[in-house]
Amino acid sequence: MSTLPLLLHSVSYSGSWGQTALSVEQFAGKAASLDFDGVMLMAKRPHLSPLDFDAARRRQLRDHLAAAGLRHNVLAGYTNFTADLEHAEVPQREMQIHYVEALAELGADLGAPYVRIFTGYEHPAAPFSAQWRLIVDALGECARRAARCGVTLLLQNHHDVAAGWESFRDLLSEVNDPHLKAGFDAWAPALHGDDLAAAATALAPWMAHTTVADYVRRPRHRYEPALVNYVPVTPNVQAVPFGEGFIDYRAFFGAAVQAGYTGGVAYEMCSPLLGGGAEENLDRYARAFVAWMRAR
């Protein structure tokens, strides 16, 4: 694990959940100072929206990343191909495919060979089988368009459709395009109660990247006055320093590396942390991740 490239996700310093916010240039300097090999850049405002980066600004950012010694860089796109299915007259899929193509062009200009994307959240306006077909078709077109830019897409197992690792593997197999790889994470199968080693072994042939964070479960209960008692509800999942949570990353990485995985590992702080969102606490979490990975 100590040989895998380590990336810091810029969502961690984006202010998205009330934490310290840095500009994309400030963030790159931060990642370099924390001894990361590269960055995963949030491809939307306030960091890296294609709307805000013309050719000159792209060249400046590429030079900035190179000067900081950040060589392993990925763009993080945000897609939901099943969005707004109740309004068929709006070309949502076309707009999102165009967004992904714009990110592929942006990645090529920055020297970033990968763009992360998602599937879709299940929508009540269409049967599951129709949503699956829609996503397969959209992913295939996105992959073909990315290939023209010399960029490969990373599909992350995050949204509802194909969240389970077996379904995720099925989806990748059905699209069957060399420019669509797996950005397969341990987080979802860990929450599902799956065997992480088995999941990593099964997905290893498709894996080119993974994004990580660690969590603990905190029980929640709702008081029922008529019963003078509490009713359990879905636990909260709280972000904690890497290696201190319930996700068995030793098993996940051990199996992935044994199966031949050599891709990058991006650390993200995308939800409230124990200790808060001050820059010092964000830095502490990032250092803990680097130390954990480099010690193994």
Each model region followed by its residue ranges:
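Active-site groove signature of glycoside hydrolases
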Residues: 107-128, 149, 154-158, 267
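A short, acidic, flexible beta-alpha connecting loop/helix-capping segment that sits on the rim
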Residues: 266-281
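Active-site beta-loop-alpha junctions enriched in small/polar residues
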Residues: 11-14, 42-44, 77-80, 120-122, ...
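Active-site cleft segment of glycoside hydrolase catalytic domains centered on the general acid/base Glu
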Residues: 124-139
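Acidic/histidine-rich catalytic cores of soluble enzymes
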Residues: 5-10, 39, 139-246
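N-terminal pre-domain/capping segments
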Residues: 1-108, 130, 147, 177, ...
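Short acidic/polar active-site loop segments enriched in Thr and Asp
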Residues: 37, 71, 113, 208, ...
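A short, acidic, amphipathic alpha-helical segment used as a generic capping/interface helix at domain edges
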Residues: 244-258
